[in-house]
């Protein structure tokens, strides 16, 4: 997993929750799923 403040470049990146959680929270990433859904998908 990359640094937690990195953006989600691809849907697969969201399989690393802490990589994208901050970007998702700030609506900076391309992941639009909820955090709980990220865990379930991966």
UniProtKB/Swiss-Prot annotation:
Disulfide bonds join 1-15, 8-20, 14-31, 16-42. Belongs to the neurotoxin 06 (delta-actx) family. GO terms for molecular function: sodium channel inhibitor activity; toxin activity. Expressed by the venom gland. Inhibits tetrodotoxin-sensitive voltage-gated sodium channels (Nav) by binding to site 3. Slows the inactivation, and causes a prolongation of action potential duration resulting in repetitive firing in autonomic and motor nerve fibers. Does not depolarize the resting potential. Does not affect tetrodotoxin-resistant sodium channels. This lethal neurotoxin is active on both insect and mammalian voltage-gated sodium channels. It comes from the Eukaryota. Is the sole lethal toxin in male and female A.versutus venom. The presence of a 'disulfide through disulfide knot' structurally defines this protein as a knottin. Its main location: secreted. Keywords: Disulfide bond, Ion channel impairing toxin, Knottin, Neurotoxin, Secreted, Toxin, Voltage-gated sodium channel impairing toxin. GO terms for cellular component: extracellular region. Pfam families: Atracotoxin. It is found in: Secreted. This is Delta-hexatoxin-Hv1a.
